[in-house]
Amino acid sequence: MRNRLRELRAEREWSQAFLAEKLEVSRQSVNAIETGKYDPSLPLAFKIARLFGKAIDQVFDDGE
């Protein structure tokens, strides 16, 4: 699943470690989500969207 996580994080000048702390996940998890190696659970996806003040479909794109 494609996502805008890296772009949104960069706009705020947040490190992966800072975002990971906010989301209560590892930095490696943030990296894996950003690179598309890991799709977040639905609760985590909603948490990410809320953190950035976006609708979930503004952060994640399933390619359809």
Functional labels for PLM-detected ranges:
Residues 25-38:
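Recognition helix of helix-turn-helix/homeodomain-like DNA-binding domains
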Residues 11, 50, 60-64:
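Short, charged recognition helix plus adjacent turn
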Residues 10, 38-39:
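Short amphipathic helical patch at the helix-1/turn junction of helix-turn-helix
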